[in-house]
Amino acid sequence: MTVSGKAGGRSSVKGPGPLLSSVIVATVAVVIAFILYLYAIILTGSLVKVWGVNNEITLENYSYVFTHGSKAIKDTLLIACIGTPLGGLLAVLVGYATARLKVRGSRILETVSLLNYTLPGTVVGIAYIIAFNDKPIMLTGTIYILVAAYLFRYSSAGIRNVIAALSQIDPSIEEASRSLGASSVKTFTSITIPLVLPAILAGMRYLFIHSMTAISATIFLVSVHWTLITTRILECMTELQFAQACAFSIVLIVLVFIASGVINLLARALCRSGDAIGVH
């Protein structure tokens, strides 16, 4: 028996009436306009000399960002690029152990992996400082504590995505592969991974974006050796350098949009490759 997912009869559920549709459209339009207004304010602020005092158009703020803030940009991208693939790997391992292996304690592993995200960022930052500020594992002031904080805090979305994707895949597909002589590793890499790849990439994108934009835990973990764009924005705001803070924000927004676009293109390319392999 094949379940196509198509309705077998005419649906009796009616859509919203004209009045309700107009209200929904108007509400969405107001929200979108407000978001675009905020982006426009930040962009405008990044192009003036002194916000509210000297509104002469200038690019000096961006020159400041790429001269005095180049290290923060490099560090932010490096940490995000290191943590993102590790987050994808962690999501696959925890998700597969929970949804497929069902080993003893797998639910506890899932709960613990999600618990880190439910805690406030300030609590997480302080906890990492206390936990890794002394031997045998001393990570304070290094890149490793930042990567670990982002990895274990923001990989929860990827874990949930993988678990949800695996729960929708019939285990008999993998059993059929193994019954035809494929090893467990071959089945995992050739069958399971391609099927849950969109969920993995969605989780990786979530982790990358939050690694770029996180601030609550970050302010406790940065050091003179490692600084991030978000902390530079905070520094500019505390020093009343609003134009420079806006310029840093625009650079961060552009980087996040570029990263999201690249991951989307990668997802489409990999999905097409998977479809081509399936056809052949």
Describe each PLM feature range.
Residues 1, 15-20, 46-71, 212-264:
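Interhelical loop and adjacent transmembrane-helix boundary motif
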Residues 1-75, 140-143, 266-280:
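N-terminal, non-cleaved signal-anchor transmembrane helix
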Residues 1-15, 96-98, 105, 163-174, ...:
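C-terminal transmembrane helix and the adjacent membrane-cytosol boundary/short C-terminal tail
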Residues 6-16, 48-52, 56-59, 67, ...:
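Membrane-interfacial helix termini and adjacent extracytoplasmic/periplasmic loops
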Residues 17-25, 93-128, 278-280:
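Cytoplasmic-entry segments and transmembrane alpha-helices of multi-pass inner-membrane transporters
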Residues 25-36, 115, 152, 159-162, ...:
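Transmembrane alpha-helices
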Residues 37-40, 44-47, 89-93, 126, ...:
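Membrane-embedded alpha-helices of multi-pass transport/permease systems
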Residues 67-98:
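Transmembrane alpha-helix signature in integral membrane proteins
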